């Protein structure tokens, strides 16, 4: 199943433009970013390139970093990936390790590039694996605290009500993918962070 998912993700990956924008903000990751249909307008006037694709896992991010991310020479990378790893039963340590390897590869090639890690969603469909989601998020938050070029951003508060219950109105019927109001909440949290990182 993992092989089939990786193959499907590779086939779904969009091709980079012949002359892509460089020096901007690149969004990498899985469907949460890929399906953010109003990303560019909600982040305007920030220069956004979105190379996320459905079904991707953290191993895909490692495979594409040299060919599809580093050539764009982004000033900032927004990273959301790991949710599909969780669904496949991967342990937190393995997921975290691949995320850190991605960051380290970027830092080696582009030492001035900032990486903004967006927390993995505690989606209702994965409630039985929230402990893994929380562990990955916690480990990356700790990593970011000791690496000045990395920032951790928690978007999960958008997805829960005042009683700590998931806001099902923000999810599609699969209780995994998000409706437009969820992305509005994400933009309110993420845009100030990216604006600051891009301006530094």
PLM regions and their residue ranges:
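N-terminal secretory targeting modules
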Residues: 1-28, 32-44, 71-72, 108, ...
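Conserved SGNH/GDSL esterase-like catalytic core that processes O-acyl groups on lipids
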Residues: 19-101, 124-134, 138
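Secondary-structure boundary/capping positions in well-ordered alpha/beta enzyme cores
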Residues: 46, 75-76, 113, 147-150, ...
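Conserved beta-strand termini and adjacent loop/short-helix elements that scaffold enzyme active sites
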Residues: 51, 118, 153-156
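Alpha/beta-hydrolase-fold catalytic nucleophile elbow
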Residues: 80, 118-119
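Charged, glycine-enriched surface loops/patches
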Residues: 96-118, 135-150
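Catalytic His-Asp segment of secreted/periplasmic serine-dependent ester chemistry enzymes
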Residues: 124-200
